[in-house]
Amino acid sequence: KERIITGSGSGSGSGSGSGTGTGSGKDAGYTPTMQRALPWILAILAGLVLALAMPGPGIWPLVVVFPVLLLEALDRTRTWWHAWLLGWLAGTVHWLAATSWVYDVMHHYGGLAAPAASAVLLGMALYLGIIWALIAGVVFLVPSVWRIWFFPVAWVAIDTLRRFQPYQFPWNDLAATVAHQPVALASLPVWGATGLGWALVAVGAGLWGWLRRDRRHVSAVQLIAAIGLTISMSALSPGFESAGAPVRVALLQPGTTLEEKWNPGEFEEIADRVWSLTRRAADAGAKVVLWPESAVPFRIDTDETYRRIVTELAIDLDIQIILNSIGGSSGNAFANSAYLVTTEGISPVRYDKVHLVPFGEYVPPWAEMVTTGALVREVGRFTPGQSATLLPSIVPLGESICYEVVYPGHSAAAVKNGAEILITLTNDGWYGHSWAPDQHFAQVRLRAAESRRWFARAALTGISGFVDPYGRVPERLEVGGQGFLIADLTPIRTVTPRARWGDWWFVLCAIGAVGLLIWTRVRPVSPLKEA
């Protein structure tokens, strides 16, 4: 498959305001058993509908339904502990559904028996569900009427913590649900995916309030604010300034399965496939060719034959090759690295992956007992890179390897360092035909729109593709496909507010959440009267 594309550039309960009550009006007709069960049912549905809104199922309008369900569940409980458990249940259900592919990774490729793989998935879901529990517990501390405004900022302030230790798993942020809608991405250069995520939750919280007649005046303000701010941020978003002539870039997708990759008898055929695709891409006019992560089963830092073949290929075809290989680091450690090969040889500047994959490239100490050698090669010996080093290609390239494209700050750092085109090399072969490839690719669209950069993604088994500075995808190679794509990518020097100022909307939400929490706890009477 060969394609050439061209792109240009109240019941507030107790006097403290922390309870909610379950007014008899809205529970009329429910038996006591139903009244007790309903919050749990609503919590389960909240987690499930958000999973269905994510890429894969892609029923994106459900993203504004989950706040309605979760807030209603919290409004029907009387104790903080109950609210905390409801949030934990909702979060656990969400991650069980949204990342169900973890079972296949652990069972099929990790060598774990089915019960053990199921236990890993459940443990992961319970662990990530704690974030939802924290959100629910904090939201419960606020009087019911204030939750319309408080829930969105609390969600952003707490859920964003998944980017940091001990989680380091910012997978499936809310903006990913609308990553396929370029109009929805128009505001990202200003407030990033964090801001758009807040707007989606704010709309959902506003809809919950609108369904309560006594709160429609509050919800109307919320809805107007969320929609108005999104439109305003879109209007304030900058265009982009070209930094030079377009660069013709090719993406290879060899389609090599992990079973082939781990079979020494297949090594020669795997390499020949990559050489052939590279030559065909060069014949089509490519000047820079991107190989995906783990494209060939050799190490460029220790295998002299491999180094010679790749260098000769670059010289003979008059191209530059960006490839992935394990690279030696200090001591006996290793880095997951990206190398630039030119007609002058292998560049001394390499990029070492900064954000390593939990259970893939390192194992948290508490989880070492469930890790197998088949899943984690040289586990514990990978060391993270220290910065978003640019590859000095025809234009400066900002690199992400596989999983770390889910970190907004990483691409932003590359842009601030001078990257004019962003690239990512990945091996999504672990995921098969699950929801994961779509979830992963959605993050590339978000990063492209946030940074106003062309983003090129080469994936071993798919999805490969080019994403333009507005988050649109001219064309892509699907999972299981084999071939290459070529596009003329415009280098861009514009630095967006999101890249320049960092995740400023997260900071505002954190301040707002703390401020609202204190305000509602110390003020004896809410300025907003509930009917």
Provide a role label for each language-model segment.
Residues A28-Q35, E241-A245:
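Extreme N-terminus of proteins, especially the signal/transit-peptide cleavage junction
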Residues S237-W501, W505:
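Soluble catalytic domains of enzymes that build or remodel membrane lipids, polysaccharides, and related
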Residues Y30, M34-L236, G432-H433, V444-R447, ...:
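Membrane-embedded alpha-helical bundles of multi-pass enzymes
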Residues I5-G29:
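Small-residue-biased low-complexity repeat regions
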Residues I5-T6, G29-T31, R163, P297, ...:
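Short amphipathic alpha-helical "recognition" segments used for binding
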